[in-house]
Amino acid sequence: ASGDAERAELIAAAQQLQWRNKAISDTYEPGSTFKIITLAMALEEGVVDMNSSFYCGGSTSVLGRSTPVRCWKSGGHGSQTLTQAVQHSCNVAFVNIGQRIGEERFYDYAEAFGFFERTGDSSAQLTGTTGIDLGGESGSIWWSEDVFCNPENLSQLAAASFGQTFNITPLQLITAVSAC
């Protein structure tokens, strides 16, 4: 009988070790859910308003990128208002919005939203956490400032504008959206 109790205890301990709180321990590319953050940055900076319009032909060229950034709708959305660009989740419109914000301001906002903390080394890849008092919290994965803010290569800004090529935890995304 004592063997059964020990075995049950070992199984319980092993299961506990396997448990992870994925909201804080795993990072993901946020994709289109990040467009809320980009939109908040743009509205705050006054680079877009409810009268802004965008044209989506299905793709757009970006300085420093050999292939165009494509919208999920290959034929494009055509002319659209800001509201329609959000409703359509249009990547091309959000690349344009990101370019209006600019790489330096976008980077500053990303830091202000808590996705990373600058270290003083502009060539360092950055991470950030929410500071939640739970074990196992992972940090985000962001570009170095030198790479992101390179005016001759805006591909990172373009991709970040619609939530690609960086990783954050679900809790970081929820925290940032709550601040919008």
Task: Locate the predicted segments by residue.
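Beta-lactam-recognizing serine transpeptidase/beta-lactamase-like catalytic domain environment
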Residues: 1-32, 37-180
